[in-house]
Amino acid sequence: RGIISSYQAFGLNILLAAPTGRAAKRMTEATGLEARTIHRLLEAKPPEGYQKNEENPLEGDVLIVDECSMIDIVLMNALLRAIPPHMRLVLVGDIDQLPSVGAGNVLRDLMDSCVCKVVRLTKIFRQAQSSRIIMNAHRINEGLMPDLSNGKTTDFFFTEKEDPEEAVAEIVNLVQTKLSRYYQTPSSQIQV
């Protein structure tokens, strides 16, 4: 919202996009502005391709694209071809999330290339900073062993089971009791 507000202060026309419908919906909810899928933004018309391209570029001053780690090389190529020279492009994403299903790891490659300005955010807002899931994810990224200890008031659980049936029983117990209690959510609302 801060980036959007800054551009709006200069009267710039902002486009918002994301690779999936779910991500676009979250972006709309978070910003109060309409976000579209990249395919919809580019006016995909299979099998011909995209209506928005070099000859018929996007209209606007700024394009902000969220969840960029999910964008493969083919879709990013189509997107970049549709951006006119004057348009500013802001790519938002987490390179530590799963990469795109299609070919390429575009966001990571762009960040590693050093050809564009990169800003890394280090403060976590989605979950409490006391989250052991987040803490252990950071430890793993730093090449450290995660804290595998268990407790009653934690969002991180580690268990080892050799027998597949015991593993299934432990997962069921985890969902029905531990996670349900920790998140104060019915087990029917927890996805595994």
Kindly label every feature range from the protein language model:
Residues 11-12, 60, 85-88, 114-119, ...:
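Short glycine-/polar-rich loops that comprise or flank the Walker A/P-loop
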Residues 66-67, 93:
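Walker B catalytic acidic pair
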Residues 42, 71-72, 98-99:
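Catalytic P-loop NTPase motifs of RecA-like helicase/translocase cores
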